[in-house]
Amino acid sequence: MRKTTNTIRIEGARVHNLKNINLEIPRNELVVITGLSGSGKSSLAFDTLYAEGQRRYMETFSAYVRQFLGNMERPDVDKIDGLSPVIAIEQKTTSKSPRSTVGTITELYDYIRLLFARVGTAYSYVTNQKMISYNEEQIQSLLLEEYLEQKVILLAPIIKSRKGHYRELFDSLAKQGFSKVRVDGQVVDLTPGMKVDRYKTHDIELVIDRFTVKKEETFLKRLNESLNTALHYGEDVMMVLRLEDNKARYFSKNLMCPTSGISYPIPEPNTFSFNSPKGMCPVCKGLGVQHKVNLKKIIPDDSISIAQGGLVPLGTKKTSWTYKQIETIAKCYHFELTDPIRKIPTKGMEVILKGSQEKFEIPSAVLGITRTYKIDFEGLEHYIESSYEEAATASIKRWASNYMDSYLCEGCKGSRLREEALNYRLNNCNIADLVGMDLKDLYTWISELDQSLNANEKKIATEILKEIRVRLEFLLNVGLDYLQLNRSSKSLSGGEAQRIRLATQIGSQLVGVLYILDEPSIGLHQRDNDRLIQSLLALRDLGNSVIVVEHDKDMMLSADHLIDMGPFAGKNGGEIISQGTPSETLKQNTLTSQYLSGKLLIEIPTKRRKSNGNSLFLEGCTGNNLKNIDVEFPLGIMIGVTGVSGSGKSTLVNETLYPILNEHLFNGVKVPLPYKKISGLKYIDKVVDINQSPIGRTPRSNPATYCGVFSEIRNLFTLTPEAQIRGYKPGRFSFNVVGGRCETCQGGGMKVIEMNFLPDVYVECESCQGRRFNRETLEIRFKGKSISDVLNMSINEACDFFEALPKIYRKLKMIQDVGLGYITLGQSSTTLSGGEAQRIKLASELSKKDTGNTFYILDEPTTGLHFEDIRVLLGVLNRLVNKGNTVLIIEHNLDVIKQVDHIIDIGPEGGSKGGELLFSGKPEELIHVERSHTARFLAKELELQLNTVT
């Protein structure tokens, strides 16, 4: 019998910068892969192990199915043995759909909808009375009980508060043998040609029968027939009108308010779905927001004229059809397009914005005739709104969104649901109340719910509540207690989305799977780190292998097996420099082991910088969970914004402060979250948000093009004698332009060979041998190097090569200084990690002329960075500050927090229990704040370092 292998064995892995490595990874253990940024961690974990696992999975399908699914490229590896089914849990945001929420992606909302559909109690949105439903027997019993010996009329409601003359309806009822109807409270005879005022709203009921209620057997037969007829014509709804006091009461087989007569259909799960027509708000179609045109964005400056571009969406294109229509409007309302907008008559401006279908006759003094002008113009506002709602392409929608703002839906107040769904309650809460709770509070509410249910409801709800509790527990265990189920998926950070997927996988209880995770600790405060580690260990204990690409110290020390890659990055990395248990790794002489043991550390500054005396002062911030806080941002120093996950850091900085600065300095269109006042804007002249988004989205984008150095290099090649003789321009040396590039591969350097049922194969272009340019272009050389040779240089090599050319050297030196000397000039931007992309952006900013009044914002810049990378990054940030600029960092990493000059701590908890300003001042002073979780961990770090130094 074949023995099951206890390891995953990799032989000859050469993906990206991997140096033909051979490796054995233990199965059913928590394995952490660490190393410098660019050392090959992701190449090993995702581009080798995961890629091969996915490829093998795809091969289990038939050739017919594979042609529809597409095929995956085989990773460059000789052999992988012992590979289990692979699931990768990456940092990608879950979904960009506005309909996707935390509740939908975790499936918790599905169970909550089911809970409300089965045991929720309906209330009238008119009277707030409990809704009731009856069957025929119950209605008959109630009539005999409550109306005995009383004269009543049985009515079938046909029209409820609608306009129309209803002549055809009355004629149809008369033909069916009915003689009377009740119109707006008055019983009238049906007469030929009868109709009512079509412009008024009416209530019309059909008179079915009129009698005195008795208990005689002959009467009961008549009553039963009349009830069935009334329910048939009233579509399961009927009325009883007592003649003594003219008081009506409704009865329905559906849920109905006995006083107002409104009815709800029998609830189903889709009654509470904002993605179903049965549940969604009819105003916003289940989105929770409405988009309306903002006039300030259409006319930012009313002192200039339309001809000068005063109507921003219109611009100055005088040949457009819209412009011609506005010329007609100007003639009709007697103004010139050269007049300042503020001087245009109110009516004329209204027609431009709202539209008109009018005809105008204007006499011409010159010709002595009268010309008729017809305005057939929908108005700029309507044009922009319809462009947004009916956009055929993403670019049109994006254009229209520049002139619109999002507002909370007036119909559902952001709940996404129609009125009926919001009036089902459980324990005094509707479904919107539940999805708006922090997950921690929701767990408490769900746990206590069965106390308010009767025996029958408990029996129905038991399994549903169990499923909800289990899923909530997993989310709480990965540190997401501050999220709400109605939180939009696209607003989640990569770390939050990853931990949601992790919780879902733990809940699936799969066994024998290989899980690969990419830095699950991103965005997680130290307080929650232990819970995350315990969740990963729980995944392992189920019988799974867990591989984590991670830089977090606690995660490394908790691993069963630690793989350290290096020794450096790029071409100088891609090797396994140590592996074993954490205790074995500590004995090695590697960068990682030295930082883990404390031999190397990022030191506390001997002196904190002082502000330049100026500040930004932001008052009355109330966005999301912020509790009306006033925050001062001292300028000219490094500021750290700290707090547990969900405390309000991103709300304060990314959603409030940055949009304000961007709007003030660059007319940014993003609307900041609510605040009262900001002062000190005059002290900054530029704001830069340096995030980890890619520097380009196509393989043709590279560090040289992003930093602007490639243009200088191309210009340099045109100045060579041979290029001058041939008349070559800069475009000749671009792989994106026809002429100089290789047309066989169109400047890509690689050709794709379609293999039908086998994966596509990428081969080196036979015409240019992967050099991207044609022979004539490659003949042009500068200092013996062709343009292709230059693109294949590492940044370190390029710095030496261009040292005598300040314009090029300065930009390359900045990339080298941020620790990216190992990447090549022409390296595709799609192969760069988030940390590498962020540092290239930093280098680009450093190379620009500096005013000394720039405000830099970085959100978790340590994502994907090793201890040594963080040290280099801090050196770069300190250079920016030393030039007089302000650097604001949102961060959990204690190595960064202890380096900043000023800390703003938000908390104390996440979600509704956060949003307070706990502290603003020096790091050494923060450690005395008892309510701050950051203070507790920072105190340990400062104490540890002092002891190490001592």
Model-derived regions: residue spans:
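Conserved phosphate-binding elements of NTP-dependent enzyme cores
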Residues: M1-T950
